[in-house]
Amino acid sequence: MKNVTDSFVSLVHWPSAGSFGFNTDILATNPINLSVVLGVLIFFGKGVLSDLLDNRKQRILNTIRNSEELREGAIEQLEKARARLQDVQIEAEGYRAYGYFGIDEQRHESINSTYKTLEQLENNKNESIHFEQQRAINQVRQQIFQQALQGALGTLNSCLNNELHLRTISANIVLFGSMKELTD
């Protein structure tokens, strides 16, 4: 606030005409001083400002160029992605159609396989039953044969006495002897 009041005071109080100097008080300066300051600023600041503006312009142009390249790359990638998406959708549709066909085919194969397995199980069951029947029949035959043999042996043992036994042995010896002579 003091600077503002000093400025107004300096407006009221003009310096003496014989002095020469640089007046920093902007309200107390004359147009010549202002034009000198502005001329110096324009002369020296023009190159700096021009360089700054040129650099800024180049950076903006480079940024625009890079953005255009990135945009073109993004558009190209987008087109590739769309083409890939379309290929994948076609492939997925093919898999879906093949999947439905495959599922139906697998269902038929599974049903046929189940029927074949059931037939094999039925055949195995029938073979097992037949085998068990044959085994039971063979066991019964063997038991009947053993009982018949035991009965025959019992009958022979009870019917044979020593004399009949000796005559049978003698007859067999004679029979074997005659067979031996025929073969010699």
Swiss-Prot record:
Q: TM segments?
A: 27-49
Principal localization? plastid
Q: Does the keyword Signal apply?
A: no
Which top-rank group of organisms is this from?
Eukaryota
Q: Which family does it belong to?
A: Belongs to the ATPase B chain family.
HAMAP family per the record?
A: ATP_synth_b_bprime (MF_01398)
Extra remark: In plastids the F-type ATPase is also known as CF(1)CF(0).
Q: What is this protein called?
A: ATP synthase subunit b, chloroplastic
The organism named in the record is: Oenothera argillicola
At the highest ranks, the source species' classification is: Eukaryota, Viridiplantae, Streptophyta, Embryophyta, Tracheophyta
